[in-house]
Amino acid sequence: MATGTPAAELRELTEEELVTRLRESKEELFNLRFQMATGQMDNNRRLRTVRHEIARIYTVLRERELGLAVGPDAGDAA
């Protein structure tokens, strides 16, 4: 069962919110890697989930950059 954020939910966020989520996820990944190195990690699956979430965020940002998808505030500008 996936516990990460679905891509559809990420597509509803603004770019600022995506960048904030990306920063938070990267910080969490750093902490998880530190826990793994010190032998304190209790949930190895979380490491993979966070990496996948980071990839999803990058994918949504890239889709917007290429014009394949528009953000939620793009429709209000017209």
Curated annotation (Swiss-Prot):
The keyword Ribosomal protein applies. GO terms for cellular component: cytosolic large ribosomal subunit. CDD domains: Ribosomal_L29_HIP. InterPro entries: Ribosomal_protein_uL29, Ribosomal_uL29, Ribosomal_uL29_CS, Ribosomal_uL29_sf. Keywords: Ribonucleoprotein, Ribosomal protein. One of its GO terms (biological process) is translation. Belongs to the universal ribosomal protein uL29 family. This is Large ribosomal subunit protein uL29. It comes from Rhodococcus opacus (strain B4). The lineage of its organism: Bacteria, Bacillati, Actinomycetota, Actinomycetes, Mycobacteriales. The gene is rpmC.
